[in-house]
C-alpha cells in the first residue's frame, strides 16, 4: 500500500486554442472588479495582452499593468507590483507571460493579504492567509507555473533564490492557450522545452513521487519526446506547439505534487549568482545530474528513456539508462543548449562562487528528494562537470 498524497491544481483550467477568450467571464465569476496585470516588458506590449485587456474592459473589469518583471523575478518585483496593486485598489491579479511573470504574480497575490516580507514564507506551507484571486496565462511552454503551488523569487539582499511552496499559491484559474507560443524565439523554445523535460523527469524519479504524479510526469515526458525537436525546427507547427504546452502543464502538475530534485536544487544558486534564466540552467545541468543519479533508480530512469523513444522496450535497464544519458547530451546539442562556460561566466567568477552555490543547493532541500542523495563534494563536482 502507498501513503496518501495531497494533490493541488487550479480549480479551473482552460486548455486549447482560444482559451484566453474565457478570461473575462472567469474573472467575473470570481467577483473581481479590478485586476493588476503582471507581465514582463516584452509581453506587456503584445497584441495578445491588448486583446485580453479589451475583452476585460468590455466585461466591465478595470485593470492596471505592472510590466517590469525581470527574467528571474525578485523580491523587488513583488514589492513594486504590490505597491501598484494597493495604489489602485486591485482585488485580483492576472499573470501574463512566462514562469517569471506567473511566479511574481503569485508573490504579489499572497502578499496582498499577508504581512511582513516574502522571505518570511520561504519554505513549505508557511503562508497564513489565502491571497487575492490569481489568474495565470502562460506564454511559454516551460515552467508549468500556472499549475503549481510553487513560486521561486530571488532575495536580492542575500543573493538566494527563495523557493516557496504553499497551497495558497495555486492560481484560481489557468488559461493554457498554445497559440500564444508561436512567436517564441528558438533559444527560448529550447531552454523552456528541456526545462519541461526536467520537470517531468524529476517528478517521476523523485522520492516523493506518487501514483497521480506518475501519470502527469509520464505524459509530460512522452509529449516532449514527440514534439520538442519539431517545435524548435518548425516554430509555426500547431501540433508541436500544442504538445509542448500540454507537456509543460502536465510537468507542472507532476513536480508541484511530488517535488523536484537535484537539478533544480543546483539550478537556483546558478540563477541567483549569475542571473541565468531558470530554464537554461536546468537544461545545462540535466545530463550531468542524470548521469550521476541513474544507478540509484535504474527502473525509473529506464522508463524515462523508453517513454522518450530513445530505448526499445526490450532493452535492459542498464542499456536504457545509458541511452538516456547520451540522449540528453544529444538533445542539448541539437537545440543548441550551451555549457556554463559559454554563458559569459568566467572561470574565476565561477570558482569563487562554487562553495556558496553548493552550500545553497544542499540547503534548499531539493537534493534530498533525488534518487541518489549527494554530498556537498558531489554537488561541487557536478557544477564543475557542467562548466
Positions of the model-derived regions?
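Mobile late-domain/C-terminal helix-loop "cap" segments
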Residues: 287-387
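Glycine-rich phosphate/diphosphate-binding loops that line cofactor/substrate pockets in enzymes
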Residues: 21-36, 54-59, 87, 334
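N-terminal amphipathic/basic leader segments beginning at the initiator methionine
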Residues: 1-30
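Active-site segments that bind and position negatively charged phosphate/pyrophosphate groups
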Residues: 203-330
Amino acid at each position: 500500500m502507498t501513503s496518501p498524497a495531497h494533490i493541488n491544481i487550479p480549480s479551473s483550467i482552460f486548455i486549447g486554442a482560444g482559451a484566453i477568450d474565457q478570461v473575462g467571464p472567469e474573472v467575473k465569476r470570481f467577483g473581481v472588479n479590478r485586476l493588476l496585470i503582471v507581465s514582463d516588458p516584452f509581453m506587456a506590449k503584445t497584441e495578445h495582452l491588448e486583446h485580453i485587456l479589451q475583452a476585460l474592459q468590455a466585461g466591465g473589469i478595470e485593470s492596471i499593468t505592472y510590466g517590469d518583471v525581470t527574467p528571474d523575478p525578485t523580491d523587488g518585483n513583488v514589492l513594486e507590483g504590490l505597491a501598484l496593486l494597493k495604489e489602485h485598489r486591485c482585488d485580483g491579479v492576472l499573470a501574463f507571460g512566462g514562469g517569471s511573470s506567473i511566479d511574481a504574480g503569485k508573490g504579489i497575490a499572497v502578499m496582498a493579504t499577508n504581512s511582513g516580507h516574502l522571505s518570511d514564507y520561504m519554505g513549505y506551507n508557511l503562508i497564513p492567509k489565502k491571497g487575492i484571486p490569481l489568474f495565470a496565462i502562460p506564454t511559454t511552454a516551460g515552467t508549468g507555473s500556472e499549475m503549481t503551488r510553487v513560486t521561486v523569487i530571488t532575495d536580492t539582499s542575500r543573493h538566494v533564490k527563495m523557493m516557496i511552496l504553499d497551497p495558497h499559491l495555486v492560481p484560481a484559474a489557468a488559461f493554457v492557450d498554445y497559440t500564444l507560443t508561436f512567436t517564441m524565439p528558438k533559444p527560448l523554445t529550447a531552454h523552456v522545452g528541456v526545462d519541461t523535460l526536467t520537470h517531468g523527469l524529476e517528478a517521476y524519479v523523485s522520492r516523493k513521487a506518487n501514483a497521480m504524479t506518475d501519470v502527469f510526469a509520464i505524459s509530460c515526458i512522452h509529449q516532449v519526446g514527440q514534439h520538442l525537436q519539431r517545435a524548435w525546427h518548425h516554430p509555426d507547427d500547431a501540433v508541436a506547439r500544442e504538445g509542448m504546452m500540454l507537456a509543460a502543464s502536465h510537468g507542472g502538475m507532476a513536480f508541484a505534487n511530488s517535488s523536484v530534485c537535484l537539478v533544480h536544487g543546483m539550478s537556483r544558486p546558478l540563477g541567483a549568482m549569475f542571473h541565468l534564466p531558470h530554464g537554461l540552467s536546468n537544461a545545462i545541468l540535466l545530463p550531468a545530474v542524470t548521469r550521476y543519479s541513474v544507478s540509484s533508480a535504474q527502473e525509473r530512469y529506464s522508463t524515462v528513456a523508453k517513454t522518450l523513444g530513445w530505448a526499445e522496450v526490450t532493452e535492459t535497464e542498464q542499456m536504457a539508462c545509458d541511452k538516456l544519458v547520451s540522449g540528453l547530451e544529444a538533445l542539448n546539442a541539437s537545440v543548441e543548449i550551451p555549457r556554463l562556460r559559454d554563458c559569459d561566466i568566467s572561470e574565476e567568477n565561477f570558482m569563487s562562487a562554487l562553495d556558496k552555490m553548493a552550500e545553497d543547493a544542499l540547503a534548499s532541500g531539493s537534493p534530498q528528494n533525488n534518487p541518489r542523495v549527494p554530498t556537498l563534494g558531489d554537488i561541487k563536482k557536478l557544477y564543475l562537470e557542467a562548466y
